Amino acid sequence: MIIGIGSDLIDIRRVAEVIERHGDRFLNRIFTEAERAKAERRAKNEKMVVATYAKRFAAKEACSKALGTGIRHGVWWRDMGVVNLPGGRPTMQLTGGAAERLKALTPAGHDARIDLSITDDWPLAQAFVIISAVSLATS
């Protein structure tokens, strides 16, 4: 059963402006170490670096909406990180207040699953998050 849906659309140029203005202070406040490492591996192409950050920013916004909190009520930027599953599919890894909120949303006898779709087409980046409760009972 679906327990949360969130989406976000962001102008990649806005993210570029914020990075230009605030640099590491912004990057350290918003992104996990794994997210920063992924973006910096694309350092040969500045547009790809910024698009990578923008997609992850949009994913965090979408996830916070799916959690029903936004970026408040104990859910902070670095509590949510985009990671890739072994096959390459992106998902969200939650810690801290975001993980606590997810646990509170998940009904007893269920596990939470977070599905994430991220994309970019200059100058826009988009993310869509669906949080589902999957029954632990076997068929």
Curated annotation (Swiss-Prot):
The gene is acpS. It is found in: Cytoplasm. Its cofactor is Mg(2+). Keywords: Cytoplasm, Fatty acid biosynthesis, Fatty acid metabolism, Lipid biosynthesis, Lipid metabolism, Magnesium, Metal-binding, Transferase. The keyword Cytoplasm applies. It comes from Bradyrhizobium sp. (strain BTAi1 / ATCC BAA-1182). Gene3D superfamilies: 4'-phosphopantetheinyl transferase domain (3.90.470.20). It catalyses: apo-[ACP] + CoA = holo-[ACP] + adenosine 3',5'-bisphosphate + H(+). Belongs to the P-Pant transferase superfamily. AcpS family. Its EC number is 2.7.8.7. One of its GO terms (biological process) is fatty acid biosynthetic process. HAMAP family: AcpS. Transfers the 4'-phosphopantetheine moiety from coenzyme A to a Ser of acyl-carrier-protein. This is Holo-[acyl-carrier-protein] synthase. Signal peptide: none annotated. GO terms for cellular component: cytoplasm. It comes from the Bacteria. Mg(2+) binds at residues 8, 61. One of its GO terms (molecular function) is holo-[acyl-carrier-protein] synthase activity.
